[in-house]
Amino acid sequence: KELNYNECKAVIILGNEKVFSAGLNLKDLMSAKETSEVSLIFGTLRDLLTACREFPGPVISIIGGHAIAGGCLLALASDYRYGMHGTHRMGLNEMAIGIDLPPDMLSIISHSIGRENLFEVATQCRMYTPSQAKKKGLINEIIGHRLTGKKKATSQALEEAKKLAKFYIDAGEPFVRLKQSLMHDTNFDYQVLIDNWFSADTQEKVKSV
């Protein structure tokens, strides 16, 4: 559903206690036989990330479960990310299975974690613990401590997210203009990504996952 700023002034993205988002469904990608099918899948992810970045109001993620690949990108497309302690992991594994990270997605990553962490996070395919993720900028703030249950930590994070959202909403147009000024126009022919998906090397890597 299209985000309408007139009807909704803020967005809070919350997964469950096990998974924030695992990204694209590899089974759907593997079963796709036509380039149009793959184009639709990757295009949907691109449109979702663009909607988060272009939404004038605050977009805040609460990450209490695994945030992998496209799920990690979704979190990074948020303006602020709350995390919590747990055994879940967060990271980008696209390169390990031969999937391109286009410039528009790299722009989202760089904007969120800074260029000093971009190369490692984008190329080494590491899966970070919540504490490690915070050090790399994948998470802005961890709610609770190691003995805080996820249900309680999620409740606390939701309250903090609502307060932060109100702060940004009350800031008004200066926040909207600042957010828009941080957007980078990046042109990329997604057909390159789609063609690479069908390459023998990528297909072999995906099958081994």
PLM feature spans:
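Glycine-rich beta-to-alpha active-site loop
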Residues: L48-I97, M127
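Well-ordered beta-strand positions
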Residues: Y80-Y82, E120, Q124-R126, Q132, ...
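C-terminal long alpha-helix characteristic of the crotonase
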Residues: G83-H88, I139-Q191, K207
